[in-house]
Design a protein with these regions (language model features):
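Beta/alpha (TIM)-barrel catalytic core signal, keyed to glycine-rich beta->alpha loops juxtaposed to Asp/Glu
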Residues: 4-144
Length: 144
């Protein structure tokens, strides 16, 4: 599953503000739908992407209570510049045996060295998506 359905912080957005009317609580409904795909042989297991510690915990809790499929993995960013997985998700992943599939291991290419000294190689990701490079990883790399 890619992106939580509920309102939460994505891509480094800070200052989470909870509003009761934004509450989303369809964890069981989602797991039940995915269970049907497993029984039909269309998928073997399920994972989450860009999920928070609370969201992963909630999916695991509902799957245990309702005897529904467990979350096998979480796919979130993890690299030398973005270590947010370690602040809550790492412990849950280990204790609940829900593996990490790290994406952006080279910090969108910044750790490869190709953007060093302001270089912008033609046909690179940052050449195509100019605003994409204005994220936290880019700012942190400048300090190295």
């Amino acid at each position: 599953l890619h992106w939580p359905e509920r309102k939460t912080n994505f891509f480094g957005r800070l200052n989470y503000k909870h509003k009761e009317e934004d509450s989303w609580n369809d964890f069981e409904k989602v797991l039940t739908a995915l269970e049907k795909f497993i029984k039909q042989g269309k998928i073997r297991c399920i994972g989450l992407s860009n999920e928070t510690p609370w969201g992963l915990t909630k999916f695991l809790e509902i799957s245990k209570i309702k005897n529904l499929p467990r979350i096998a993995s979480i796919q979130n960013p993890y690299n030398l510049l973005n270590r947010t997985h370690e602040v809550g998700l790492a412990e849950i992943s280990v204790r609940e045996k829900s593996g990490l599939l790290a994406y952006s291991p080279l910090a969108s290419g910044y750790l490869s060295g190709k953007y060093r000294n302001g270089q912008m190689p033609k046909n690179s990701r940052m050449d195509y998506f100019l605003n994409f490079g204005q994220d936290i990883e880019h700012l942190m790399l400048k300090k190295l």
